[in-house]
Design a protein with these regions (language model features):
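Short alpha-helical segments and helix-capping/turn motifs at coil-helix boundaries
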Residues: 30-41, 96-101, 117-119, 124-127
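A generic secondary-structure signal for well-formed alpha-helical elements
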Residues: 5-11, 15, 83, 87, ...
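Short, surface-exposed, polar/charged, turn-prone segments marking secondary-structure boundaries
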Residues: 26, 77-82, 89-90, 141, ...
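Charged, low-complexity surface segments at secondary-structure and domain boundaries
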Residues: 14-27, 67-70, 86-93, 151-162
């Protein structure tokens, strides 16, 4: 039993990476200490939201027991394997959306961004984030464009039109309109306005904010 525990302990540290400290202080003081202990301001127990993490241990959100969009996992649902590449995120066993894909965050209901306090200029990583609180060596920034799950649309876009958008801009379009097959678009024509072409001039930070405000209504 002792040998088995020692083996698992060694595998744990190798898997976590030596980058985070040979003494294990990072895992003890930041990762494990945050398990079920991260306190988000005004948190509603029934509210679902995701966390984003910048330039840190991939699975830190899992240690903290908080749903997140950055992870390293060998067992990945097909839906994720299909969705992430579609919106310009490299997908293998690691999910690491880049900060230039800022519109993906509200689309995935990201409410907070955690950044190590050693990082500089963190407040400018993505548009629409304001400092909220600090805990376990991280500064947490709240996403002003956070969208709770279950938002609705008044506009639809045919999949064939959505497919013409560059990968890095598809999340922007998907905030403005829900992607539908031709049959679904025609079936819902009485309740959805069709986005027949993409206005690329609106696919920026301001356009994202406007789309988020529309989804909130």
């Amino acid at each position: 039993l002792t040998a088995a525990v020692g083996c698992l302990h060694g595998m744990f540290f190798i898997g976590s990476g030596r980058l985070y400290g040979t003494s294990g202080s990072f895992l003890r003081e930041r990762a494990l200490a945050g398990y079920d202990s991260i306190a988000f301001p005004g948190e509603d127990e029934d509210e679902f939201f995701r966390l984003d993490l910048y330039n840190t241990l991939d699975n830190l959100g899992m240690y903290w027991h908080v749903p997140n969009i950055q992870a390293f996992h060998s067992i990945v649902p097909n839906s994720i394997m299909e969705f992430y590449p579609y919106v310009g995120v490299k997908r293998d066993v690691s999910s690491k959306p880049e900060v230039n894909n800022y519109a993906l965050r509200p689309l995935l209901s990201v409410k907070y961004l955690a950044v190590s306090q050693s990082e500089k200029d963190a407040e400018n990583l993505m548009p629409g984030y304001t400092f909220s609180f600090s805990q376990f060596g991280y500064d947490f920034y709240e996403n002003e464009n956070y969208l709770p799950m279950g938002f609705g649309y008044t506009t639809g876009v045919r999949q064939s039109v959505l497919d013409t958008a560059p990968l890095s801009l598809r999340a922007n379009v998907m905030l403005e309109a829900v992607g539908l097959s031709d049959e679904a678009m025609e079936r819902n024509a009485d309740i959805l306005t069709e986005l027949e072409s993409i206005d690329y001039a609106s696919l920026n930070a301001s356009g994202m904010e406007e789309a988020v405000e529309e989804r909130r209504q």
